[in-house]
From Swiss-Prot:
Cross-referenced InterPro entries: Glu-Q_tRNA(Asp)_Synthase (IPR022380), Glu/Gln-tRNA-synth (IPR000924), Glu/Gln-tRNA-synth_Ib_cat-dom (IPR020058), GluQ/Sye (IPR049940), Rossmann-like_a/b/a_fold (IPR014729)
Function summary: Catalyzes the tRNA-independent activation of glutamate in presence of ATP and the subsequent transfer of glutamate onto a tRNA(Asp). Glutamate is transferred on the 2-amino-5-(4,5-dihydroxy-2-cyclopenten-1-yl) moiety of the queuosine in the wobble position of the QUC anticodon.
Gene Ontology MF terms in the entry: ATP binding; glutamate-tRNA ligase activity; zinc ion binding
Cofactor, free-text remark: Binds 1 zinc ion per subunit.
Protein name: Glutamyl-Q tRNA(Asp) synthetase
Residues where L-glutamate binds: R13, F14, A15, P16, S17, D49, Y178, R196
Required cofactor(s): Zn(2+)
Gene Ontology BP, a term: glutamyl-tRNA aminoacylation
Family that this chain belongs to: Belongs to the class-I aminoacyl-tRNA synthetase family. GluQ subfamily.
Motif ('KMSKS' region): 234-238
EC number, as in UniProt: 6.1.1.-
Binding site for Zn(2+): C105, C107, Y119, C123
GO cellular component, one term: cytosol
Amino acid sequence: MNSRHPSAPYRGRFAPSPTGPLHLGSLYTAVVGFCEARRRGGAWLVRIDDADRQRCRQTHADSILRTLETHGLWWDEAVLFQSLRDEIYRVALERLAAGSRVFPCTCPRRELAGSGPIYSGRCRARYPHPPAGEHALRLRVGDAVIGFDDRLQGRIEQDLGSAVGDFVVRRRDGLPAYHLATVIDDAEQRVTEVLRGVDLLDSTPRQILLQECLGLPRPDYCHIPVLTDRGGIKLSKQAGARPVDEDAPSENLWTVLALLGFVPEPPLIGAKPAEILDWAVAHWDIRRLPPGRRIDVGGLAV
């Protein structure tokens, strides 16, 4: 399905997973999305991607929302929590099953890890009926070749069969996979542009295929450079990124804006977060983002 009509009001979203407190890399993504939405006179939404019950914690979700508030990054509508939407995802899976788009997979994790990143198709025709035990569900990819135009990264095309193969849409434990939950929630929230880190660029063709299978609208996409340390490693919780200091929101915002090439005007030094964000929105142009796929934070304590 084509993208939304260009006259539709802009709707962006920030969708962190509550596996830990907000760090500088996540704050940077939130600031870029917030400024883009405000500059375009649109809405900025927040969604908590907590479908993974094993890794996500409500305390972290509360912390993330509090940090956004402290930094003046106020959202426009009620926060959506994936953990409350299991029934919606189940119905979508039933639709895929009714169209023979998914199949059960019982491949052990160890076997999958040893066979490389591309699924072999071992279970594709193995089960005429769903097995009784635990099993994942995979989407049949076939010969799908997906192309899209990313606002910053240009034309992207991917042959899903040779790049990833049939991919998981429901995990063995019954929880929805990231790609399924993401496309359903983006559609329900009427997101017109998915703005996120370039590390998720390769996920987009899978999500577009799911949108086509479920008859969902395709939003526009804008994948921004990620923040990395001096070793070129993306700032992340897994890599030990520190939580942002909630006692220094103005300083944190200026750090993010400086990494983006924005230099504060003297009267704004020491300003409150709301004033800083108003200034940033007034001067905002996403084309000013540094070129490439990463921004080195240098010697910052992150």
